Amino acid sequence: MRHALPIALPLALLLASPPALADEVPGFDRPGIGFGTDSVPRGALAVEIGLPGFQRERDRDGQRSTTLSSDLLLRTGLAPGLELQLSSTPWLRQRQRGPDQPRTRQRGAGDSVVGLKWAGPGSTDRTAWALLASGVVARGDAAFSDGRQYALAASVEHSITDRWSGALYASHQRGDGQRSTTWSPSVALAASDRIGLYLEAGFTRARHQPDLSVAGAGLTWMLRPNVQLDASFDVGLDRDSPDLQLATGIAFYLD
C-alpha cells in the first residue's frame, strides 16, 4: 500500500482540478525513450504517470524474467526555460525463472531521481533543443536499484512539415563503476489535432555489458487540452535486449 500513494494522489488531483488555463500546454516528456524539448512555466506542474508497464526478457543463460512497473514524473518550472524534475518507480514486481531452477518473485521500488531540464536558447518554431542533467538521490530496493547514477542527456526536435517531425536523443550515464551511452532517433506524425503517432529506435552501449538495441512505436491521445493518454511498445533487435516492452500512461498539466 505504501507504494500506491504516489500514483493515487496525482490521479485524485486530476479528477478534482479544472482544465489548465494556459493558452498553450507544453509538450509532455512521455512516452518514448527520449524527452521533449518544452519546459514547464514557473508555477505550473506537469504530472506524468506510467500505468503498469510490462517487460519480458531472456538472458544468454536461459533465465527468463517478466517485470511489471509503474513510474512517476513530476515537472515544475523554476524560471523561463528551466524546470525541476522529480522521478521514481514506486511500484515494481518481477518474476524470474532459470533452467532447472525454481521460480522467484520480487517486489519493491526503484531509485528516485532529481533532474534539471534546460530549454536551450536559439530554439525556433521549427527546431528546438534541450538538456537534462539528473542524478539518483534515493536508492530503491536492492533488487531494483542501479546505485548512485548521474546522467546528462540532450534532445533535438525538428518540424519537417506541419504534421511530420523528427527527433534525436542522446544521453551518457555513469556511476558505481558503470558507464553507458544511449542514443535514439524517432519520427512523429500528428495524425489529427488530438492523436499523435511515432516510431523510434534505441541503442545503448555499456561498459562491460552487452550492447542493447530496440525499436518500437507509440500513440498519444489528448483526452482534454491538458490531459494526454499514451500507449507504446518496443521489441528487442538482438538476443541481449528485452524481448518485449509494453507501456501505457497518463499525463496532465496544471497551471
Language model segments and positions:
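Transmembrane beta-barrel domains of Gram-negative outer membranes and organellar outer membranes
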Residues: 22-255
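N-terminal signal peptide c-region/cleavage motif recognized by signal peptidases
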Residues: 16-19
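Bacterial N-terminal signal peptides that target proteins for export
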Residues: 1-8
